[in-house]
């Protein structure tokens, strides 16, 4: 299988979010359908492997060495599950991914078999910080989780980022986030 433009999920979902429910302020105004000059907000596709997707992710955390085969296998798994919404912003003039964030849907038995959204891996490339792309991705994925009928959406962040996420209606939970790592 060769990298192509097939999206991980239906791109119309991003256009159908109810932007009137957005709680963040954008100046200048941007939206999922108008993210800025030369920019497109869309689902990840396998061709993004060659558009700097891992370069951007690497600005957030260690990505490790990922072969094209590994990438394709993970992409197909996520696509088939229907519960992964890896979203990117592409600078179409450069043909490069400049920002990404992921919404993952968890299916629960609680709350009448409800769904919970979880935001992961929000990162904007160094060159594009200050263009509100992180805000745009977070607002879009938050509204998408509502459209997908999630009963709540959560995320984990560093203490210095709490203020940023509060702008979108997120609150600090009384629960503790705990982790046990198996890989360093």
From Swiss-Prot:
Q: Which residues bind acetyl-CoA?
A: 130-135, 165-167
Q: Which Gene3D superfamilies match?
A: 3.40.630.30
Query: Which pathway does it operate in?
Result: Nucleotide-sugar biosynthesis; UDP-N-acetyl-alpha-D-glucosamine biosynthesis; N-acetyl-alpha-D-glucosamine 1-phosphate from alpha-D-glucosamine 6-phosphate (route I): step 1/2
GO CC, sorted alphabetically, is: cytosol; endoplasmic reticulum-Golgi intermediate compartment; endosome membrane; Golgi membrane; late endosome
Tell me where it resides.
Answer: Golgi apparatus membrane; Endosome membrane
* Subunit structure comment from the entry: Homodimer.
Designated name of the protein: Glucosamine 6-phosphate N-acetyltransferase
What organism is listed for this UniProt entry?
Answer: Homo sapiens
